[in-house]
Amino acid sequence: MNIWKSLLAVCLLIAMFGCGASASKKANQEGAAKQLPRLCVTGTQLMNEQGDTVVLKGVSYGWHQFWPRFYNASTVAYLSGDWGAEVLRASMGVDLDSACYVYKPEFGINCVTTVVDAAIENHVYAIIDWHSHNLRQEEAKEFFAQMATRYK
């Protein structure tokens, strides 16, 4: 019975990503000229420029080294277009296995920036998550300095 569930899951994923191509074009055409409103945190609330509380709905990606196949522009287009995601969280796996940021920083940076760049193209907010079970302050400073320079 488990093989049938696995087969169904694979078929659904193929169908889901096959439909994403048209969503990508539509999102790029509609979102290219738009700029996302600035948001800020006041106390415990996310607020827009008018001071109204904002609630975003979205998707959190799993760690990049475990699910890199989803860290691409067509997945972002599908999630923003068909699912209506307004925010995407790209999770940088820092130190869990041999494919994590500590051992393969270029791979991790490529995965995360691919999602963020596609989020910008699709008019979606992006959160970059430095996901580490250990304190790696120096590596985090270096990484976020690079991200801040790229996305300022």
PLM segments and residue spans:
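N-terminal carbohydrate-binding accessory modules
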Residues: A21-V87, V102
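Active-site-proximal helices and loops of the catalytic beta/alpha 8
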Residues: N28-V41, E49, C111-A118, N122-I127, ...
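C-terminal motif of bacterial Sec signal peptides marking the signal peptidase cleavage site
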Residues: F17-G18
